[in-house]
Every structure is written in C-alpha cells, then in structure tokens.
Design a protein with these regions (language model features):
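TM-loop-TM module centered on a large, flexible mid-protein loop between adjacent transmembrane helices
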Residues: 153-198, 215, 234-255
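Hydrophobic, small-residue-rich membrane helices and short re-entrant helix-turn-helix hairpins
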Residues: 56-67, 121-149, 167-173, 201-219, ...
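Transmembrane alpha-helical segments of multi-pass small-molecule transport proteins
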Residues: 1, 29-56, 70-81, 113-121, ...
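Hydrophobic alpha-helical segments and their helix-loop junctions in multi-pass secondary transporters
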Residues: 20-24, 29, 71-95, 113-117, ...
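Hydrophobic, membrane-embedded alpha-helices of multi-pass small-molecule transporters
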Residues: 80-86, 95-161, 180-199, 291-310
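C-terminal membrane-solvent junction of multi-pass transporters and transport-like membrane proteins
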Residues: 71, 260-343
Length: 357
C-alpha cells in the first residue's frame, strides 16, 4: 500500500504538471503574463477541480468519463490528422543507432513506456466493482487491449510528429502543425485529459493511504494526496526543468514499481489467486496477514533487494555501476523485477503457506 501510494502521488504530480503547462499557455493567449503567482493559482485550481471529482469517487467518475472520452477522442482525431499531413514518411536519422547504443535506447524507451501500465498494478480500485462471475481472462484481456491500442497509436503519432517538428517540447511543437483555430481547443483538451486521468490517480492514492492503516476518511486522504502532489508539481515546474523532471521521474519510478509489481504478481501466482478476503482486510494483530509486527518480512526483503538491484542498473539521474559497465544500457526494470521475484519465491513460501486459503 505504501509503494502504491508513493507511485500514485508521483504520477498525480507529473500529470498535474502537464495540465498546468497547457493551462499556462492558455493564460498567455488571453494576454496575461504567466507570472509565478499566476502559475501557483493555476496549479491549485486544476488540483482543486481534480480532487473534487476524486472525493465524490467511483459514481461520479463513471458518469463523467464517457462524455470526456468522446470529447478527447474528437480532439485527438484532429491532432492525428494534422500529424499525418505533416509527417515525413521518408525520414531517416543522419546517424542511425547501432550496437550497444541502439540497445541502450530501446531498453530506455521500454522502461519509460512500461512505467505507466506497471504503476496501475496495485491499484485495482475499479476492477473490485466487477461481479465475481466476471471471467478473469476477459478482465485481463480487455484491460491489456485497452491499454495497448492507445499506447501504440499515441506513440506512433508521436514518432511521426518528430519527423516534422522538434518534439523535445511536444506541446509547443504540435501547435506549429495544428490549425490556428484549434490550438486553444488542443490546450483545453490537454488540461481536460490530464484532469480526468488524475481524478483516477487521486482516487487510487486516497484508497492506498487508507490501506496503509491511517484511520481517516477518504476525503481527508484524497486532500492530503493532493497537497503532496501540488508541492511536487510546484517544484517540478518552478524549480526544475519540467521535461527533465518528467523523464527522470518516470524512469526512476521503475526502480520502485518494477520490484513492487514483481512481489505482488509472484504472491498471486504462489497462492493461485486464492485469498481470504475477510482475513486480508483484518488489520489487527490477530489477522493471519499480520505477519511479523504487521510486516511481511519476506516481501519487504524481496522488495528492497529488487530496488537495490534496479538502482545499480539505472542510467537516468545517475549512471549505476552495472549500467556503466554495459555502455549505458539501463536494465533497471528487468533486473529489479527478476531479483524481487526470485527472492520472494525463495523466502516467502512459508508465509504464503501459513496464510493460504
């Protein structure tokens, strides 16, 4: 729960920063100057709108997200059409990557993309509303397909756009190939999209904080998460360079969520997905899941071991010794997940057997 909360708050901050950046551009288009006080007000206002949706929870989210999805799909279609019109389909880099450099870029890109879906692993806050009769394969299949198709389409359009404009600053770059009348709509769509995404993230973060054991209402937990995310966003936008912050954060987050996911998935496999739901939600020392002082020691050791292994392989904010020895190749994701899975299988069998259903 702690790991899930940390990941959710980090993504809340990153998404909020993206929405705020688009909102700053909207403010500038009105003739106002986006001074630091104005930026702070914009960030807080977007966070307040997001948290209002999260506080009301699942019911409001379900009602709002169909019309939001349709509106965003329309905006995305216009952007996609503009990208296809301007893309250079004959583009070839001046110096194609080969050998170790090619693999280093491929692994870094995979790690960056994987950070998104992996971050949702411990946030099954909507699947819990599905009936028990829902086929597990169907749930997994449709979830994977729903994540895979948009990722491929969006990533492909991003790559095509990079053949026409400098995508180191995607928001400003795309405005150069969009019709002038559509630019404000594009910016509003960016804000709306990130607000809708963050409402889900804040909802999950609030539940994760409650799952840690704090006796607070979901409203209080969501507001606390929002305050933490706003603080991180202010740092990312007003102190650090935004794109560097996003890139580094997404890749460093993998150091945590890779091992976290591995422990979670390995536990599911060892138990064959059979859990005593009542006992699992019992947070008292009498619960079979209380383990040692409330800590599953094998799980904690496996997590820390995986994080340590991943940290040695990082090549983002710093270059770990393993990454350095491999010519800059970042293997933090596979290394962290593999080490955590092996450690948990080796150390956790007794704990799993003691709490088996």
């Amino acid at each position: 729960a702690i790991g899930g909360w940390l990941v959710s708050v980090c993504y809340f901050a990153l998404n909020l920063a993206a929405a705020a950046t688009a909102a700053f551009a909207l403010v500038e288009r009105t003739g106002l100057t986006a001074t630091t006080p104005v930026k702070v007000v914009v960030i807080v206002a977007i966070a307040a709108l997001t948290l209002a949706i999260s506080v009301y929870g699942h019911g409001l989210i379900i009602r709002l997200y169909l019309p939001i999805t349709l509106a965003l799909a329309g905006a995305f279609a216009v952007v996609g059409f503009a990208v296809l019109r301007h893309a250079d389909f004959s583009y070839a880099p001046a110096e194609p990557l080969t050998g170790v450099d090619l693999w280093a870029v491929l692994v870094a890109g995979t790690t960056l993309i994987a950070s998104g879906p992996l971050s949702y692993t411990t946030s099954a806050d909507f699947s819990r509303y599905l009936p028990r009769t829902a086929p597990a394969k169907a749930v997994a299949g449709w979830t994977a397909l729903g994540a895979f198709v948009p990722s491929v389409v969006v990533s492909s359009l991003g790559a095509l756009a990079a053949t026409a404009v400098d995508m180191t600053d995607p928001q400003n770059a795309l405005q150069k190939i969009l019709p002038g009348w559509f630019v404000p709509v594009f910016l509003i769509a960016l804000v709306l999209g990130t607000v809708s995404l963050n409402a889900l993230t804040a909802y999950s973060a609030g539940l994760a904080l409650q799952a840690v054991g704090f006796r607070i209402s979901r409203t209080v937990s969501v507001l606390f998460d929002g305050a933490a995310a706003v603080a991180l966003t202010l740092y990312g936008l007003l102190v650090s360079h935004f794109l560097d912050t996003v890139s580094n954060a997404l890749q460093v987050i993998v150091v945590l969520i890779g091992p976290l996911t591995a422990v979670y998935a390995t536990d599911i496999l060892l138990r064959r997905n059979r859990y005593d739901g009542v006992a699992l939600t019992n947070e008292t020392p009498g619960s079979p899941f209380w383990f040692t002082g409330g800590v599953n020691v094998p799980g904690a050791v496996a997590l820390l071991g995986g994080v340590a292994a991943a940290a040695l392989c990082v090549n983002t904010l710093y270059t770990g010794p393993v990454a350095g020895a491999l010519g800059g190749m970042d293997l933090s994701l596979p290394a962290g997940m593999t080490v955590s899975a092996i450690l948990y299988v080796s150390l956790g069998r007794r704990a799993v057997a003691a709490t088996a259903r």
